[in-house]
Every structure is written in C-alpha cells, then in structure tokens.
Amino acid sequence: MKTISKQLSAVIFPFIFSACVSQSASSLNHQTAAKARVELALSYLQQNNPQLAKINLDKALQHDKNYYLVHSALAHYYQQQGQIENAFREYEIAVNLNHKQGDVHNNFGTFLCSQKKFEQAQQQFELALNSPNYYHQADTFENIVLCAYSAQKMDIYQQTLEKLRQIDGKRAEKFNSLK
C-alpha cells in the first residue's frame, strides 16, 4: 500500500492550481496573495520543511479564508503530516467552497482511497470527471485504477484501465506489471 500511496501522491498535486473566476479587485488581490502563499507552502512541503509550509498556509488563510485552494493545500499538508481528521475536514471545506473544482474532487478521492474508503473515493473521482473545465481525466483514471487495485475491485480496475488506455496508452502500460 505504501507504493500505491506514493504513486497516488505523485499524481494528485501537480495540478492543484486552477484559474480564478472573475471577482472584485480587492478579493482578487487577497486571492492572489493567498495563492502565492499556497505555492510557497507546497514548495516547502516538497523540500521536507513542514514548519515553513504551515506558516505559509496560515498566512494564506489570513489572506482569504474562503478560497478553496487554501483549504485544499491545507488538506494535503495535514495528509502529509498524518493528521487524518484535519485532512478530511479541510477537503470537505474545499469541496464546499467550490464544488466545481475537479482537482479537489480528484485529490479528495485519492485521500479517501488511502484511508480505504473506496466507495466514497469513487464518488469523488466521478465528481472530478464530471466537473466543468477539468482537464486531468487521465490523472483521475490512473487514481481510480490504483484505488481499485488496492481495494481488490478487479472489475473496476479492468474497466478503468481500458478507459485510461484509450486516452493515454503509455500511462496504462505501466500497470501491466500489476496484473
């Protein structure tokens, strides 16, 4: 499961950032500042510096506590720190703040799968795939394949692997060794 968790983590956060919708100049400035802090925090997490990551996430919250991206990044931070309840809470906040963000649904699904909550994960993956302006279907299909494999849901594994093969055959090939 460790290998699958690492693979899931590698797939979920390269595309956390999404475009902002048009808003007032003031709220956009707050959102821009919050996004900059989130980017710094994610950099610090990659450098294995959770203390500076958390400081920047807290500052991002001060800039815009109603920005889904801040809560999504906080969820990722808590997940990395093993604070499962906090991660779950932050994913729920992020989804409630903007339910149209496929990336958040995909990441939440990956988190739920890592917690062995397969059915809930599947729901989040479906929401991701059905989100408007979501362009990372291959990532989500890959996450579904990994999740189904870890849950021993071989019918879903095979069906989704075929979907992945149709849109990104090269990605699907790496699963040949899992059979």
From Swiss-Prot:
SUPFAM superfamilies: TPR-like. The keyword Cell inner membrane does not apply. It holds the Pfam family TPR_8. Keywords: Signal. Residues 1-27 form the signal peptide. The keyword Repeat does not apply. It comes from the Bacteria. This is Uncharacterized protein HI_0366. It comes from Haemophilus influenzae (strain ATCC 51907 / DSM 11121 / KW20 / Rd). The lineage of its organism: Bacteria, Pseudomonadati, Pseudomonadota, Gammaproteobacteria, Pasteurellales.
